[in-house]
């Protein structure tokens, strides 16, 4: 049971069965089985494969595992590109955010910024409909959408409907605001903030709920995502999320501690758990973005942080790690993160 569950065992005929939940489980099962013989996939460029003339398992051998996270996707020196070696490594370590079709294809979760970038592009609408966009510093600006603009929401709904009709395979659609803090301050949006008792996140939640209500019956298998990030970290206190709205958590925290020991992080996460406990996906950080080569001991917190996410029942995990072949412990962090994303309980 569960996304990407695997099972390896000796059946009654004495045959070794290597299987798992389709579409990716059987492939993961094969690689995890090899790990029991000492094979290690350290990075796309480094592996350990012990030499042996034969392999044998006991009749009672059994390897069963159900990853606690449905979605597991890193962004690191080991998997930030699309080279054949990186594509293969992602499969070997159990990532599923970007998987080739011949290995089962990806788990297509998304929570990247899309508003004004992918949808409702100002070059298409702003000149004719400035009222659809944010009122900032006394004038309409193409920085964000105006959450209280009926015309803007109608146009946004039409764009999302058209995309889902063109791509019926989609299961997640990101409705995340542009990566800036220039949110609408018009009277209508101020009322939304007051009603939901929230800041900028209240506007994103309002937009997502509107889209989710309008399109939910037409596309019942689709989830719409928002992102708790930067000026949107605090959950609106008086909001409810539609059942087809999921949340990404990109909450800042001290990197020298696991999140289970970060009081502020836990307070912010608790606010979102009240809204969508079974629909939370993590966007984490294990890098110093001013200098990837800067020594940082944050990799020692990966295990406990991932165990905390699993205990809380979060649905998926992703992380931005250091990039560049000379990055501080870059390959080691990527390997450890992948191992604990697959099984947070393991001891490495």
For each predicted feature, which ranges?
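Feature activates predominantly on carbohydrate-active enzymes
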Residues: 2-206, 213-218, 248-249, 273-297
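Substrate-binding groove of N-acetylhexosamine-processing glycoside hydrolases
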Residues: 141, 165, 194-348
């Amino acid at each position: 049971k569960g996304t990407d569950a695997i099972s390896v065992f000796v059946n009654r005929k004495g045959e070794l069965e290597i299987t798992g939940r389709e579409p990716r489980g059987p492939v993961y099962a094969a690689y995890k089985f090899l790990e029991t013989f000492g094979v290690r996939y350290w990075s796309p460029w480094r592996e350990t494969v012990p030499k042996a003339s034969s392999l044998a398992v006991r009749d009672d051998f059994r390897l069963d595992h159900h990853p606690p996270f449905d979605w597991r996707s890193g962004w690191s020196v080991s998997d930030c590109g699309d080279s054949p070696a990186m594509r293969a490594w992602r499969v070997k370590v159990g990532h599923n955010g970007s998987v080739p079709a011949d290995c089962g294809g990806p788990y297509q979760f998304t929570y990247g910024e899309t508003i004004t970038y992918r949808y409702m592009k100002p070059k298409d609408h702003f000149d004719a409909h400035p009222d659809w966009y944010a009122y900032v510093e006394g004038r309409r600006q193409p920085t964000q959408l105006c959450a209280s603009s009926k015309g803007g929401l109608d146009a946004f709904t039409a764009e999302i409907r058209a995309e889902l009709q063109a791509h019926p395979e989609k299961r997640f659609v990101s409705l995340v605001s542009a990566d800036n803090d220039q949110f609408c301050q018009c009277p209508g949006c101020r009322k939304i903030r007051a009603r939901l008792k929230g800041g900028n996140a209240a506007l994103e939640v309002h937009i997502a709920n509107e889209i989710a209500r309008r399109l939910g019956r037409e596309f019942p298998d689709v989830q719409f995502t928002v992102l708790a990030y930067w000026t949107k970290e605090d959950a609106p206190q008086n909001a409810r999320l539609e059942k087809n709205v999921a949340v990404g958590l990109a909450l800042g925290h001290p990197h020298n501690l696991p999140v289970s020991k970060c009081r502020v992080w836990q307070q912010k996460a608790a606010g979102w758990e009240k809204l969508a406990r079974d629909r939370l996906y993590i966007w984490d950080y294990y890098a110093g973005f001013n200098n990837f080569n800067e020594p940082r001991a944050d990799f020692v917190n990966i295990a406990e942080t991932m165990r905390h996410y699993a205990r809380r029942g979060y649905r998926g995990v992703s992380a931005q790690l250091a990039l560049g072949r000379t990055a501080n412990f870059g390959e080691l962090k990527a390997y450890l993160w992948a191992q604990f994303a697959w099984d947070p309980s393991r001891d490495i």
